[in-house]
Amino acid sequence: MQRAESELSTEDWRRVFQQAAKMGVLHLHLTGGEPLARKDLPELIRAGRDAGLYVNMITSGVGLTEDRLAMLVEAGLEHLQLSFQDLDEVSANHIAGTRAHAIKLALVPILKRYPLAFTINLVVHRLNLDHLEEFIALAEELQPDRLEIAHVQYYGWALKNRSLLMPTEEQVQRSLPIVDAAKERLKGKIHLEAVFPDYFGSFPKACVGGWGRQTMLIDPAGQALPCHSAAVIPGLQFDNVREHDLAWIWQSSSAFQRFRGDAWMSETCMTCPRKERDFGGCRCQAFMLTGDPDAIDPVCSYSPHHGLLKELRVSQPEALPIWRG
């Protein structure tokens, strides 16, 4: 978390968006943290649209009044993703750490009155995965354009709470036919996208579409990162948009070069027919699980550390949550 006084100014962001558009960037995703915390959010959205970018915002919805929503849409907001934590209000508020569930439900019909693409996000884990079928039914009533169901990714605070959040094998297996049936039932009405849990897989995901291939994250203070968790890897130097042009960072920054391409890969990955599909998997996950960012992602069945995941899949229901602060 950065102090507010260290954040980029409105004019800084305007310049960054213009540079991004010149590079061929198409999508601007405003996420957080919470984008609504920025008082200049309408100006940022307008700057993104003026640069020719498609503007999407991921939000908790807390603090989003209809008047403010109207301002954001008028400024050019095109897509809003609203995050939910569970079906039940008590459970959802407990997971969120705030009384937000009723606010989100009340916001949905307001969103539907505006010319705005609308996605519901649900992050699933051991505490809410058993409610998946009922949550999908709720989503059908709310009628978003998209429903994204993603298993929690074990980085940051989720990593600290992994023993609490890790679903059981039985929970995961029960969820698969529920998702498949919903995809078929909702075809042509709601696009359902589901992200399978890494720790239960045999092959890694193509994290952010490959390191330094299609995604650039700019944090509030202007640091440019190849992915959300890249700062966990020791030795990486992240250049700042206050000091360098965005195109230079993309093309020449040592952090973006570090795992771009395949020169860094082990022989196992280099000769694997899947390397153009998963690009070697997640470097942050490899580091957090093995201590070596160059290691084969342990999710991969070819990794000598793959057996570690079986041990980590053991859920500990008695574990207490670890909160910030």
Briefly describe each language-model feature range.
Residues 3, 8, 54, 70, ...:
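Radical SAM enzyme [4Fe-4S]-AdoMet core and its adjacent flexible, acidic
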Residues 34-35, 63, 158, 214, ...:
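Gly/Ser/Thr-rich beta-alpha loop segments that engage phosphate groups in nucleotides
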Residues 33, 123-125, 287:
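Short strand-loop junctions, especially beta-strand C-caps/beta-turns
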Residues 1-79:
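Conserved alpha-helical substructure of the radical SAM core
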Residues 11-15, 64-67, 103, 241, ...:
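Short, conserved clusters of charged catalytic residues that mark active-site
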Residues 26, 212, 268:
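Exposed loop/turn and edge beta-strand positions of beta-sandwich/beta-sheet ligand-binding modules
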Residues 34, 63, 86, 153, ...:
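Flexible, active-site-proximal loop/turn residues at the rims of small-molecule/cofactor binding pockets
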Residues 231-325:
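Flexible mid-to-C-terminal extensions adjoining Fe-S/redox cofactors in radical SAM and related proteins
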